Amino acid sequence: MADMKSIQADTREKMNKAIEAFENNLSVLRTGRANPGILKKIVVDYYGSQMPIDQVASITTPDPRTLVITPWDRGALNPIEKAIRDSDLGLNPNNKGDTIFISLPMLTEERRKDLVKNAKNYAEDARIAVRNLRKHALDEVKKVEGLGEDEIKRGEADVQKITDEYVARVESVFQKKEQEILG
């Protein structure tokens, strides 16, 4: 049976993972600047294997509006181009023989609002994940044997403090991303 400290540590660890997942989701949202992270979820069919794009090529940003993808094997050039074209990012790769250039167009106001809306959805998903972890932790607190009513209440209050802290972190990360998108 777990004790209060291990429940709190486990809850913090799981909530950290929820925040990391949230940040990963946000990293693929396009902002006004070129960011190699937007290609993170692209998978390339490389000699029959599905591989993340960053494992078959280097991705650089020579300027704020351009991504340059340089495959480590020229045979990967066309599959990379196809994977980018087929993705839902709406990018148009330009194959230059040994590298692929992607020019990122300016974001329209409408597109920025859509991106903020997506970010809000990711933030809400993260908040829900944190709250679900709180519920699980509260259930665990109630299962600890040998605790009096006051100790259970104190444990529940501690779990709530942890939850509030992580919900605030979600909000902070979201607001930062929102400024990045709208800015």
Swiss-Prot record:
SUPFAM superfamilies: Ribosome recycling factor, RRF. InterPro entries: Ribosome_recyc_fac, Ribosome_recyc_fac_dom, RRF_sf. Keywords: Cytoplasm, Protein biosynthesis. Transmembrane segments: none annotated. The keyword S-adenosyl-L-methionine does not apply. It is found in: Cytoplasm. The keyword tRNA-binding does not apply. One of its GO terms (biological process) is translational termination. It comes from the Bacteria. Disulfide bonds: none annotated. One of its GO terms (cellular component) is cytoplasm. One of its GO terms (molecular function) is ribosomal large subunit binding. PANTHER family: MITOCHONDRIAL RIBOSOME RECYCLING FACTOR PSEUDO 1, RIBOSOME RECYCLING FACTOR. Belongs to the RRF family. Responsible for the release of ribosomes from messenger RNA at the termination of protein biosynthesis. May increase the efficiency of translation by recycling ribosomes from one round of translation to another. This is Ribosome-recycling factor. The lineage of its organism: Bacteria, Thermotogati, Deinococcota, Deinococci, Deinococcales.
